[in-house]
């Protein structure tokens, strides 16, 4: 009797996977992982931050606080807040890094009684405009001329380039993050123009350094309005317009309508200077955005796509300038378009 072949008795042995096929499978897996990483890098939203609006009016929550706390009173500010060192000074306030219940906080003190009206105006705006776009108020004492706010260690927006040059922040030094900062800035302007306190104009903005000093850079790399001492009201219905200060302004950073219109032959007189509206803030958007975009790979590409809206912002006729909402929507479209283009290129490479 003829013997059956051994392999027929035991069934077919499992086939070995050719090395080339295994390599292709590994490459496919790596491409999938790379795609997911790119998808996260370009599309994932920022880590959310605590919004003070989650607390009732007159309350706050910072850091790891689970519950909202009422604004601190004069007595609490005097006894619970420990002043550490001065970290800033302006015409209206001196700012001190301080400590409250193991939280780093910013204590602002009035510089001189001559500036008290501006100080109280800033306090009123800070109280009334609390929300995602404004630094968190922790307490105040009008008797002592003090205001307590949340402390942000990265400081003023003026420090942006210095901060992004640090090695630990290189991962956020991209055109995507910088364009998002520009969107934050325009969002703040849009909020001020449609605030619960009416249309407010950011008057402390006569040059680039002064403008940047009005805002804070958070550890989450977003922007907050911080100095609200000069936010006059525009009311188009009643014809109420504004003038930013009582001195003659110069340069091309300020809007044309902020310049003395009667030539060098006539000395400046405040009572003859025409007033203006919130469109002066729109004029300044391209210059602020250009600073925020910096000079890194991809920033000129973003500038190119923003050229038309920025040209409109620089219209000599205020009424022809876009609104802050128009600018914000254009920024969002540009961000989406460029992000999709980069993702498409990344997919083609995989």
Curated annotation (Swiss-Prot):
InterPro entries linked to this entry: Kinase-like_dom_sf, POMK, Prot_kinase_dom, Ser-Thr/Tyr_kinase_cat_dom
The UniProt entry lists the main location of this chain as endoplasmic reticulum
Q: Which cysteines are joined by disulfide bonds?
A: none
- Taxonomically, which superkingdom? Eukaryota
Q: Where does the record place the Protein kinase domain?
A: 81-350
Positions carrying N-acetylmethionine: 1
Pfam families named in the record: PK_Tyr_Ser-Thr (PF07714)
Q: Which GO terms describe its cellular component?
A: endoplasmic reticulum membrane
- What subcellular compartments does it reside in? Endoplasmic reticulum membrane
Task: Give the bilayer topology.
Answer: Single-pass type II membrane protein
Q: Which UniProt keywords apply?
A: Acetylation, ATP-binding, Endoplasmic reticulum, Glycoprotein, Kinase, Membrane, Nucleotide-binding, Signal-anchor, Transferase, Transmembrane, Transmembrane helix
Q: Which reaction does it catalyse?
A: 3-O-[beta-D-GalNAc-(1->3)-beta-D-GlcNAc-(1->4)-alpha-D-Man]-L-Thr-[protein] + ATP = 3-O-[beta-D-GalNAc-(1->3)-beta-D-GlcNAc-(1->4)-(O-6-P-alpha-D-Man)]-Thr-[protein] + ADP + H(+)
Ranges in the Lumenal compartment?
44-350
Q: Give the Cytoplasmic membrane side ranges.
A: 1-20
Please list the residues annotated as glycosylated.
165, 220, 235
By sequence similarity, the record places it as follows: Belongs to the protein kinase superfamily. Ser/Thr protein kinase family. STKL subfamily.
**Function description:** Protein O-mannose kinase that specifically mediates phosphorylation at the 6-position of an O-mannose of the trisaccharide (N-acetylgalactosamine (GalNAc)-beta-1,3-N-acetylglucosamine (GlcNAc)-beta-1,4-mannose) to generate phosphorylated O-mannosyl trisaccharide (N-acetylgalactosamine-beta-1,3-N-acetylglucosamine-beta-1,4-(phosphate-6-)mannose). Phosphorylated O-mannosyl trisaccharide is a carbohydrate structure present in alpha-dystroglycan (DAG1), which is required for binding laminin G-like domain-containing extracellular proteins with high affinity.
Protein's recorded name: Protein O-mannose kinase
- Per the UniProt record, the source organism is Macaca fascicularis
Instruction: Please name the gene that encodes this protein.
Output: POMK
């Amino acid at each position: 009797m003829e013997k059956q072949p051994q392999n027929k008795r035991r069934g077919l042995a499992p086939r070995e996977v050719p090395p080339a096929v295994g390599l292709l499978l590994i490459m496919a897996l790596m491409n999938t992982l790379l795609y997911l990483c790119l998808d996260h890098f370009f599309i994932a939203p920022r880590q959310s931050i605590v919004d003070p609006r989650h607390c009732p009016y007159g309350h706050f929550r910072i850091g790891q606080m689970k519950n909202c706390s009422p604004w601190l009173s004069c007595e609490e500010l005097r006894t619970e807040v420990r002043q550490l060192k001065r970290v800033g000074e302006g015409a209206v306030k001196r700012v001190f890094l301080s400590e409250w219940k193991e939280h780093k906080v910013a204590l602002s003190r009035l510089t001189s009684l001559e500036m008290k009206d501006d100080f109280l105006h800033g306090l009123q705006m800070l109280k009334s405009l609390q929300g995602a776009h404004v630094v968190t108020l922790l307490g105040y004492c009008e008797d002592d001329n003090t205001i307590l706010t949340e402390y942000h260690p990265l400081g003023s927006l003026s420090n942006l380039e210095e901060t992004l040059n640090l090695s630990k922040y290189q991962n956020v030094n991209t055109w995507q993050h910088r364009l998002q900062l520009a969107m934050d800035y325009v969002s703040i302007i849009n909020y001020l123009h449609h605030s619960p306190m009416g249309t407010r104009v950011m008057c402390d903005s006569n040059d680039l350094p002064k403008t940047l000093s009005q805002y804070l850079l958070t550890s989450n790399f977003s922007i907050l309005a911080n100095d609200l001492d000069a936010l006059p009201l525009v009311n188009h219905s009643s014809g109420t317009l504004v003038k930013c200060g009582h001195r003659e302004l110069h340069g091309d950073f300020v809007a044309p309508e902020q310049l003395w219109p009667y030539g060098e032959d006539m000395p400046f007189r405040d009572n003859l200077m025409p007033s203006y509206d919130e469109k002066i803030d729109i004029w300044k958007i391209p210059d602020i955005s250009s600073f925020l975009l910096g000079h890194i790979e991809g920033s000129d590409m973003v500038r190119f796509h923003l050229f038309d809206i920025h040209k409109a912002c620089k219209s000599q006729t205020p009424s022809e300038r876009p609104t802050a909402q128009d600018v914000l929507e254009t920024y969002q479209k540009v961000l989406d378009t460029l992000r999709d283009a980069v993702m498409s290129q990344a997919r083609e490479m995989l």
